[in-house]
């Protein structure tokens, strides 16, 4: 169901519109947004039991899933750990590796598509995560660029998560018995970052154990973080002209849970962060270690994060994990 636009929402559209220049199953368990941000909670570890994080990288498989939420077409691209030889390119329809893997839902930015982020998302899958990325009906490349529709996207992600997790019990599916519904994160870039923040605030999905926000802001979704503590990693370029660094930092400052912010002094809205080889390596390694800790309970990964995040003087790291 589409959310009715209120005057407050319409005001945010004027600010969200600057983003338009950027191109780059089971019912969801949600709780209502709190009227104000909750008091900070001193949580030293994620709310996920320690698992067995992969020791070695996996080959990667890719597949597509056709979804539709009450008339909203939501094709989903899935990258997943696959069987085979390391070094092979991502293979369509490859058999999944043995094991049960955490799920990461990724949301693209305005004018973007999941494939724009394939390098990063393939690395996540190789590290032992099933990454599912919807193409949103009104904010993807070639769509009508209805910026207000970003406010409907958190519900799209929750619906897509329902359907992805249902594959775990679907007979003869590639991902049957491969998905760990108790280890789930959301991530997104730009408007996808807004979508991701919304999944922890106004549209809280309690299945989510962690979040990764790239160049995002809380415009339209607020900062009333609600529900069980879920660690958050923010990544933002300090030269971002689309979503200013200060806007991302303001949202980060409101997070009441374990959190960290990776800041790139020479980073822009996405090209440096997601395309530049040196910066991408820092971003991907930091985000992988964050996900290993928050979804697998890998304490060694948490210890690596501060050193890896600041190597090469590419980024600074504010650590409250």
Pin down the residues of each PLM region.
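Acidic catalytic loop of the alpha/beta-hydrolase fold
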Residues: 239-243, 269-270
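Alpha/beta-hydrolase-fold serine-hydrolase catalytic core, especially in secreted/extracellular enzymes
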Residues: 276-321
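Short beta-strand/loop motif that positions the catalytic acidic residue
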Residues: 228, 234-236, 240
């Amino acid at each position: 169901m589409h959310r009715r636009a209120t005057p407050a929402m319409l005001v945010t559209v004027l600010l969200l519109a600057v983003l338009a220049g950027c191109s780059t199953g089971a019912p969801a368990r949600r709780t209502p947004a709190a009227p104000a941000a909750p008091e900070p909670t001193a949580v030293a570890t994620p709310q996920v039991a320690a698992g067995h994080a992969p020791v070695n990288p996996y080959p990667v498989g890719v597949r597509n899933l056709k979804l539709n939420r009450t008339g909203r077409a939501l094709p989903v691209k899935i990258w997943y750990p696959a069987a085979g030889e390391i070094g092979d390119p991502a293979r369509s329809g490859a058999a999944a590796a043995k094991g049960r893997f955490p799920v990461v839902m990724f949301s693209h930015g305005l004018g973007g598509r999941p494939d724009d982020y394939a390098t990063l998302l393939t690395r996540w899958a190789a590290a032992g995560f099933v990454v599912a990325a919807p193409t949103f009906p009104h904010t993807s490349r070639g769509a009508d660029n209805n910026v207000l529709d970003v406010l409907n996207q958190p519900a799209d992600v929750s619906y897509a998560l329902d359907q992805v997790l249902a594959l775990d019990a679907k007979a003869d599916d590639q991902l049957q018995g491969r998905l760990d519904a108790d280890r789930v994160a959301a991530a997104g870039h730009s408007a996808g970052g807004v979508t991701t923040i919304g999944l922890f605030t106004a549209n809280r999905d309690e299945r989510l154990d962690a979040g990764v926000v790239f160049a995002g802001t809380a415009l339209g979704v607020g900062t009333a973080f609600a529900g069980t503590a879920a660690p958050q990693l923010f990544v933002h370029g300090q030269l971002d002209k689309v979503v200013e660094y200060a806007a991302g930092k303001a949202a980060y400052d409101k997070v009441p849970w374990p959190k960290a912010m990776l800041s790139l002094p020479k980073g822009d809205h996405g090209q440096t962060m997601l395309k530049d080889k040196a910066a991408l390596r820092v971003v991907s390694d930091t985000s992988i270690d964050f996900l290993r800790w928050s979804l697998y309970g890998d304490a060694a990964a948490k210890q690596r994060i501060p050193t890896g995040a600041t190597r090469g003087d590419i980024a600074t790291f504010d650590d409250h994990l």
